[in-house]
Swiss-Prot record:
GO molecular function, one term: 4 iron, 4 sulfur cluster binding
Lineage: Bacteria, Pseudomonadati, Pseudomonadota, Betaproteobacteria, Rhodocyclales
Assembly behavior: The complex is composed of six subunits: RnfA, RnfB, RnfC, RnfD, RnfE and RnfG.
Name used for this protein in its record: Ion-translocating oxidoreductase complex subunit B
Location(s) in or outside the cell: Cell inner membrane
Source taxon at top rank: Bacteria
Length: 183
């Protein structure tokens, strides 16, 4: 019995060491451009760009399969940052993918909520907490404002509430100079 235990422990140690070595030796580096693009995107995972999340959209941009102006939550600021990073010309937000809206979070009217869990299943970032047949609530710090939870709600108890403007959320305007009149 003791011999079998020692043999199994020895095998586990050897295999663990082999896996640890293999993970270091055969590590696959990702595309650094994809990582930079993904860092600029708002991480709402809303799918409004036509891709299932921000990372696939970043991969499509880096491969030249998608344009930089398909992300409504990122808005004009995100498009400008992507244009600067990729050395492309700025383009306005594509209307077929939506329109830029003020940052908002979902709010559930807990008096109307029937606890169906459809909104929990729809939320890509797990910002809604609750259990079946019990009221749900949104954790505002986690909510990205993607609006994916609104449509599945059978009793329409979810509303998008705009965030109040603070120094962090205020849209600072870019200075615009007319070069022709300045000369």
């Amino acid at each position: 019995m003791l011999t079998a235990l020692l043999v199994m422990t020895g095998i586990a140690i050897v295999l663990g060491a082999a896996l640890g070595y293999a993970s270091i030796r055969f590590k696959v580096e990702g595309n650094p451009l994809v990582e930079k693009i993904d860092a600029i995107l708002p991480q709402t995972q809303c799918g409004q760009c036509g891709y299932p999340g921000c990372k696939p959209y970043a991969e499509a941009i880096s491969n030249g399969e998608a344009d930089i102006n398909q992300c409504p939550p990122g808005g004009e600021e995100g498009i400008r940052k992507l244009a600067d990073l990729l050395g492309r010309e700025f383009k306005p937000l594509s209307e077929e993918h939506g329109e830029e809206k003020p940052k908002s979070v979902a709010r559930i009217d807990e008096q109307l909520c029937i606890g169906c869990t459809l909104c929990i299943q729809a939320c890509p970032v797990d910002a809604i907490v609750g259990a079946a047949k019990h009221m749900h609530t949104v954790v505002p710090a986690l909510c990205t404002g993607c609006e994916l939870c609104v449509a599945p709600c059978p009793v329409d108890c979810i509303a998008m509430t705009p965030l109040p403007e603070t120094l962090e959320t205020w849209k600072w305007k870019y200075p615009v100079f007319d070069l022709r009149s300045a000369a």
